Swiss-Prot record:
GO terms of molecular function: ATP binding; dTMP kinase activity
GO BP annotation list: dTDP biosynthetic process; dTTP biosynthetic process; dUDP biosynthetic process
Domain of life (superkingdom): Archaea
Single GO cellular component term: cytoplasm
Primary enzyme class: transferase
This enzyme's EC code(s): 2.7.4.9
HAMAP family to which the protein is assigned, alphabetical: Thymidylate_kinase
Keywords: ATP-binding, Kinase, Nucleotide biosynthesis, Nucleotide-binding, Transferase
Alphabetical list of CDD domains matching this protein: TMPK
Catalytic activity: dTMP + ATP = dTDP + ADP
SUPFAM superfamilies reported for this sequence: P-loop containing nucleoside triphosphate hydrolases
Gene: tmk
Protein name: Probable thymidylate kinase
Length: 210
């Protein structure tokens, strides 16, 4: 069987950068790596990328309003395709799967948007839990500094409030899911990478030998 690792964190935490560095680290050690992300590049994922959120209550896709419940179902549909067509087959083939976001993101973000956590957990019950989830924890102020160039100024206050809720939710999820480990995302990029690989060595390799 393979290894399934997920990188999570609020916007601007450096997930994509660290996922690529981690994939290279495994490849240098002879592993076959599948680097993936959510939302995916499937039809569902492309639809999600056209989603524009308004006021934390509903969203718009191509001019059509959808509820936050429909939004959660759309993310779950994308994830179902991801799991069945890529994640599970790759793990069964003995590969290392590294995902930039997974269902933990849905829990943190959609919980922050007012949906019930248990409802979200049940909705995503089909998705296998990761062997290790690396939560790149970043203060909201630094997150805003990093993503400010990507954002519309008129949405600034909404973004700050959402990121505060999401960070709080991620830290709560770390208490609920024992596969989640917290890494300080304020450190330099190379230091974060070294912290992640040391964690993997300990959690996935050394413990397996005991």
């Amino acid at each position: 069987m393979g290894i399934f690792i997920v990188l999570e964190g609020i916007d601007g935490a450096g997930k994509s950068t660290q996922a690529k560095m981690l994939a290279k680290w495994f490849e240098n050690r002879g592993y076959e790596v599948v680097l993936t992300k959510e939302p995916t590049d499937t039809a569902f994922g492309k639809l999600i990328r056209r989603l524009v959120l308004i006021g934390g209550k509903e969203g718009i896709i191509d001019g059509a309003r959808i509820s936050k419940e429909a939004e959660a179902l759309l993310f779950a549909a994308d994830r179902a395709e991801h799991v069945k067509k890529l994640i599970e087959p790759s793990i069964k083939a003995g590969k290392v799967v590294i995902s930039d976001r997974y269902f933990y993101s849905s829990l943190a973000y959609q919980w922050a948007r007012g949906l019930d956590l248990n409802w979200l957990i049940n909705l995503n019950a089909f998705a296998p839990r990761a062997d290790l989830v690396i939560l790149l924890d970043l203060p909201v102020k630094e997150s805003i500094n990093r993503i400010n160039g990507r954002s519309i100024r008129s949405e600034f206050d909404k973004i700050v409030e959402l990121q505060k809720k999401v960070r709080k939710n991620y830290l709560k999820l770390a208490e609920k899911f024992n596969e989640i480990r917290i890494i300080n995302a304020l450190a330099p990029v190379e230091d974060i990478h070294n912290d992640i690989t040391a964690l993997i060595e300990h959690e996935l390799f050394e413990k397996a030998e005991d």
